[in-house]
Amino acid sequence: MIQFVLAAPASGSGKTTLTCALLAALKKRGFGPCAFKSGPDYIDPMFHRSALRVDSHNLDLFFSAPDTVRALYAHYAAGHDAALCEGAMGFYDGLNCTTAASAWALADTLGLPVLLVVQPKGASVTLAAQINGLKNFRTPSHLAGLLLNDCSPRLHQLLAPLLERETGLPVLGYLPHLPDAVVESRHLGLKTAEEVSGLQEKIERLAEAVSATLDWERLLALTSLPAPVSPLPDFLTPASPTVRIAVAKDEAFCFTYAETLDALRAAGAELVFFSPLHDTALPEGIGGVYLPGGYPELHAKALRENEPLRCALCAAIQRGLPTVAECGGFLYLGQSLEDADGTAYPMAGVLPGQGFRVGKLVRFGYAALTPQADSMLFRRGEALPVHEFHHWDTTANGDAFTARKADGRSWPCGFANEHFYAGFPHLYWAGTSLPRRFVTAARSYLQKEPNP
């Protein structure tokens, strides 16, 4: 089975572009690849699934213990003959200026070779020195080969012998400069696949390029490993559905971890998707609703105009419908929300607070979320790893939890009670008690409210 981590010295080196190119090229060569993303980024896996029709999941050593990460990797790689893990940030960049939860830590946990993406513009021998620094910084480094990004054929011809001689690592090829294949991004990362003009043509262009410029024989030989084997964890063991849970899914609410949805199914949930933008009523017979993050700020006017759905949701929550709202879903439940132009629109009005644009990342990064009291999902004093990633804030963040970063900074946040959780932190449900608790609350609600 072909398996490797794609990493780089720093963000902006072209990992995501090369990931798309390699996945598409592997498909053209007859492989059935899957993809993984190191860290908490839900946007790239969503892009892999939508644009490339490739199964893609997150592997995060802050969210999950090493054994859980190995189990997730083995489970989601099963049935595929190639697995590509895209690293986040720089190769060794992890939690709080350590290597913890870094791309290197993931490669070390899974025992995978690493292909390093480097941009050679403006350097030659110095590039070899930088690569050797990465190669020797930790033992083992797992570095197995080099890929040159945004590189001309002539420069590749000059640099490849130098880099191989000075670093001992094979140069497996290059991706040329392709301005016509750029995938656009916005304030939280890549645009969704549906929004990128000419996306399939761009992906085809990338695949054709690396099909011609990579040494596939050497690449496949270096990355061919036995398929991973790990016992299927309980939190992914299939279960018969016992309750219907509605999950918001549309252009405004699209930031979900696929592993979270699978963990809910394994806990007994039948997931029913609906659109706060386009549907006028909640799905029938549900015992709970999950409002994930996304881009509600880009669709605030349309969300305001769908008053029937907003009213139905508000009434259901007031009746005690078990509800989880993360980040964008949390903003949707507030009193109002500004769009990108600063125009405020009424929202569901379940919670206090006006959502507003800040213009930069707010409280960005990992944190530990500790509840002040027992609630539907949480138990007092039970810390849970979370992640915040948003450019909008609200005038009422709540105080049911304390969020604390590794450097000691902390702040109050979130709303919670016996049937409710809402807040900016994104939760990673797989391997936790959250799915079982949510499903239990949903079943209990339906028993008390037979015709919700």
Residue ranges and their predicted role:
Residues K37-S38, V171-P179, E270-H278:
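Beta-strand->loop->alpha-helix junctions that form or flank phosphate-binding loops
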Residues A107, A212-T213, A239-P241, F253-A263, ...:
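C-terminal and late-domain segments of enzyme folds
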Residues P296-D374:
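Cysteine-nucleophile active-site neighborhood
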Residues P241-E307, C311-Q318:
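Phosphate-binding active sites in nucleotide-utilizing proteins
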Residues M1-I2, P238-R244:
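A short, charged/proline- and glycine-enriched loop
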